[in-house]
Amino acid sequence: MSRPVRNRKVVDYSQFQESDDADEDYGRDSGPPAKKIRSSPREAKNKRRSGKNSQEDSEDSEEKDVKTKKDDSHSAEDSEDEKDDHKNVRQQRQAASKAASKQREMLLEDVGSEEEPEEDDEAPFQEKDSGSDEDFLMEDDDDSDYGSSKKKNKKMVKKSKPERKEKKMPKPRLKATVTPSPVKGKAKVGRPTASKKSKEKTPSPKEEDEEAESPPEKKSGDEGSEDEASSGED
């Protein structure tokens, strides 16, 4: 199918030139009317909050500024007070040191004034005792000799001590004398014990000499008869 042909009209723009100029002038004289945009309630709340926050921030900043100013003033006052305190302490120390130095000077002057008359008194005393110094020195020499003699005496005493020790040697103990107990039981009368026999058999050399020197004595008649009777019994 073929499309239908449109009817085209030829338009002369020369007819509309004046009207176009008038529209341009009208647009220049009065601009298009501005439409008012309605703000939503959320945006209004946000604006109010932002306003409050801004006010609070401004108040906080003002308070901070005031505090900083006060701190600065306090620090300045404290620094001035500290300076004054340091000055007072220095002044007190200086005054104390000056007073101590004055006291020392006064004491030294007093001591010097006391020493001068003492020296004057000591001078004649030394002149009087000057002659006895030599004697004193001689006495010192005697003391030195006395010390040397003491040392010698000590040495002699030390040497004599071991001799005393030798003298104090322990003495040998005496042998206990044993007394023979009498023999119990039957014993023949007249028989000597073994110890007595041994003593009789071993005559001492002195007794032998005496027997050799002394001549044999003659037996009496009674002793001879007794010997014979004893031999007959045996």
Swiss-Prot record:
Gene Ontology cellular-component annotations: chromatin; cytoplasm; nucleolus; nucleoplasm; nucleus
Modification Phosphoserine, positions: 14, 19, 54, 58, 61, 73, 75, 79, 113, 130, 132, 144, 181, 204, 214, 225, 231
Biased composition (Acidic residues): 111-124, 132-145, 223-234
Post-translational modifications reported in the UniProt record: Phosphorylated in an ATM-dependent manner in response to DNA damage. Phosphorylated by CDK1 and casein kinase.
GO biological process, one term: replication fork processing
GO molecular function: chromatin binding; DNA-binding transcription factor binding; double-stranded DNA binding; transcription coactivator activity
Compartments, record wording: Nucleus; Chromosome
Region (Disordered): 1-234
Biased composition (Low complexity): 91-100
Keyword annotations from UniProtKB, A to Z: Chromosome, DNA damage, DNA repair, Nucleus, Phosphoprotein
Modified residues (Phosphotyrosine): Y13, Y26
Modified residues (Phosphothreonine): T179, T202
Residue ranges with Basic residues bias: 35-51, 149-174, 185-199
Biased composition (Basic and acidic residues): 64-77
Described purpose of this protein according to its UniProt entry: Chromatin-associated protein involved in DNA repair by promoting homologous recombination (HR). Binds double-stranded DNA (dsDNA) and secondary DNA structures, such as D-loop structures, but with less affinity than RAD51AP1.
Subunit structure: Does not interact with RAD51.
Annotated protein name in UniProt: Nuclear ubiquitous casein and cyclin-dependent kinase substrate 1
Lineage of source species: Eukaryota, Metazoa, Chordata, Craniata, Vertebrata
Gene: Nucks1
